[in-house]
């Protein structure tokens, strides 16, 4: 079958590739600067590096941890998000993933490990048991890890799928990219300015209300 490639300007002599305009750069210095120099804000560059190189400290307590480990396999390849470097020590990690049921005897251990992590640090609560105690409404189970440590992202499910864990990583990366630091040690409020993360239920409420055709279970 005969085919042709249409250029942006059919009469142009300097169009090397289709749909791409080739510009002639007269100054070689300007050409090298455009290739090697990036102009931007410092906190944007720092946040870009942090959100794409998260080092998780996994704290598996129950079956949710099995789903988390599944995301490290070749099928899901969580390395695409830069979060595949598991650390054995909390002093080398900046993300703690609490996956599973948190018992009362385990809460002080999690608290101590969280305190050993260096700033900036984030926490993901994975699964219904870690979020709210799940089905274990008894004296020996903590009704949510947010009772003693701050949580940035909650993953619902019993247990949640590996895709849910990867979605939580992307939401956390989006939040890290919006963080801001004070201008100096004496100007402005000290600490990290973190963006207010809107719950997915509220963010997608309008989209779900507007749905008219429901998908079959085979299409989900």
Swiss-Prot record:
- Chemical reaction(s) catalysed: a quinone + NADH + 5 H(+)(in) = a quinol + NAD(+) + 4 H(+)(out)
Q: GO molecular function of the protein, one example?
A: NADH:ubiquinone reductase (non-electrogenic) activity
Protein localization: Cell inner membrane
The protein's required cofactor(s) are namely:
[4Fe-4S] cluster
Cite the cofactor comment.
Answer: Binds 1 [4Fe-4S] cluster.
Give a GO biological-process term: aerobic respiration
SUPFAM superfamilies on file: HydA/Nqo6-like
Q: Give the UniProt keywords, A-Z.
A: 4Fe-4S, Cell inner membrane, Cell membrane, Iron, Iron-sulfur, Membrane, Metal-binding, NAD, Quinone, Translocase, Transport, Ubiquinone
* Topology with respect to the bilayer: Peripheral membrane protein
For the keyword Transport, the answer is yes
How it assembles, according to the record, is: NDH-1 is composed of 13 different subunits. Subunits NuoB, CD, E, F, and G constitute the peripheral sector of the complex.
Which family, according to the similarity comment?
Belongs to the complex I 20 kDa subunit family.
Q: What does this protein do?
A: NDH-1 shuttles electrons from NADH, via FMN and iron-sulfur (Fe-S) centers, to quinones in the respiratory chain. The immediate electron acceptor for the enzyme in this species is believed to be ubiquinone. Couples the redox reaction to proton translocation (for every two electrons transferred, four hydrogen ions are translocated across the cytoplasmic membrane), and thus conserves the redox energy in a proton gradient.
Q: What is this protein called?
A: NADH-quinone oxidoreductase subunit B
């Amino acid at each position: 079958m005969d085919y042709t490639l249409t250029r942006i300007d059919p009469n142009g002599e300097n169009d090397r590739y289709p749909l791409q305009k080739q510009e002639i750069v007269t100054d070689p210095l300007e050409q090298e600067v455009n290739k090697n120099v990036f102009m931007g804000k410092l906190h944007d560059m720092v946040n870009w590096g942090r959100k794409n190189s998260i080092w998780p400290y996994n704290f598996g307590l129950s079956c949710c941890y099995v789903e988390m480990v599944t995301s490290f396999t070749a099928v899901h390849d969580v390395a695409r998000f830069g979060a595949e470097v598991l650390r054995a020590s909390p002093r080398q990690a900046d993300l703690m993933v609490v996956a599973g049921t948190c018992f009362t005897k385990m809460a002080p251990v999690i608290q101590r490990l969280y305190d050993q992590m260096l700033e900036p640090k984030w926490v993901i609560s994975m699964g219904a048991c870690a979020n709210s105690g799940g089905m274990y409404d008894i004296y020996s189970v903590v009704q949510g890890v947010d009772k003693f440590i701050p949580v940035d992202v909650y993953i619902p499910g019993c247990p949640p799928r590996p895709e849910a864990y990867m979605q939580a990583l992307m939401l956390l990366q989006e939040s890290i990219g919006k963080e801001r630091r004070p201008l100096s040690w004496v100007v402005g409020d000290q600490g990290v300015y973190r963006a207010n993360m809107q719950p997915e239920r509220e963010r997608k409420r309008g989209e779900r209300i507007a749905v008219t055709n429901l998908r079959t279970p085979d299409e989900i």
